[in-house]
Every structure is written in C-alpha cells, then in structure tokens.
Amino acid sequence: MITNIIKNTMKRLETTFAGLKLRNPFIVSSSNLTNSAQKNKKWEDAGAGAIVLKSLFEEEIEAQAEWMNEGTHAEELDYLQTYQRAHRLEEYLNLIKETKAVCTIPVIASINCFRLAEWTEFAIQMEKAGADAIELNIMSIIADVDYEYGAFEREHIEIVKKIKQQVKIPVIVKLGKNLTNPLPLIHQLYANGASGVVLFNRMVTPDINLKTLSYGRGEVLGSSTDLYESLRWIGLASVRVPK
C-alpha cells in the first residue's frame, strides 16, 4: 500500500521542462555539486528530476592559458589557448558521457562564452556527446558608456538563432538580472527557437574589507531573498509571454 502511495505521488509530480519529460520538477542547478558523474548519480538516487552540469566557461579557459603563458611569447599564448580549449572541452564532453552512462534522468549541459563562434561549436560537441539539452549561461555586465540600447538583448537572440541552426536538442537560456524588462526578450527567445528560459543567474557579488580597505568577493552562497525577484518575473512571464 505504501509503495502504491509513493508511486502515485511521484506520478502526480511528473512534468515537462523545455520539452524534456521529468519525473518531478526538482532540477539540480549548475555548480561544483554537478561536476562529476559520481555526484550526479547520487542526485538521481536522491530523487532529482534532472541535472544541469557545471558550466564550461570560455573566459576561464583563456584566463588559464594566459596564466600558463606568463612571461613567454605571444605566439605561445595562441598555442596554449588552443591546447587549453581542446583539453577543457574534452574534459567536459567526458563529463557528459560519464554522467549519461550512469544516469537515466535528463542531463543538461551548460556553457558560458563571449564569442558567438564558441557558443556554436561547444553546443555542437555537447549534443554529439549525448547531452539531453543545453543551457546557455549568458552572464555579462554591460559597463560601456557607448553602449547602444538593445544591443545586449539582440546578442542573446543571435546566439540562440545560430545555435538552433546547428543542434536539434532543446536550448535553454539562463538570463541575468541586469535587464530593464525581461519579458520582450523572453518572447523573442522563444520565437527564435529557445525551448526554455531560466530566471535569474546569480552573479558574484563584490565587497570591501573595511580593515584592509581591499576589494574582494562578497557572499558566495545565496539565500531565500534571492527568490523574490525571480518569482516576480516568472509570474509576469507566465501570464504575459505567449506560449
């Protein structure tokens, strides 16, 4: 009897997200807690409905190459960037394959790039590795005084259009909070092929150490107050953005 109750409860929790069938709506978001197949298997065993793998950051790849190249020649930097990119991408593709080998729930790859060509190439390789969907972790602070209003939003749309021309799996866009009105952008993302939108990305917060007067990182972990802004715009989007 208890088994039947559990089965019926789980059945009622079944849902879909970005075209993926989920046994429940509990999705483990991208972090260091999803950076290995062993950890991801534990999430599935604990009852998660899907897993978003730790993001692959193009910026981190280039920064690592520059650090390795410190004090050497410019042409060596180009070589190291190429090597580091291929190495990190291969590691990530192996993470996808290894996780898919031990998990039956949907596995969503996550990428963060700043060049359009890299978004597309990474997405193609992740689909081939077996990812069930791709989350575009678009996280950027616009601080250019010559910024043209609307350019940032158009960049989001262009990225989705280019990637959807190359892959068949669902593409999900994770937006940052630095948007005046996310609703028109969400509408255009869906119109150009996005299967889902996540609100919002949590950026690293800055802080100042009053004892040393030095600049540093603020709180790393989030809190329940981070939900309020997301809940507001999720509610508005669910009503006003055409399905």
Positions of the model-derived regions?
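Short, flexible loop segments at the rims of nucleotide/cofactor-binding pockets, characterized by
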Residues: 27-31, 84-86, 175-176, 223-225
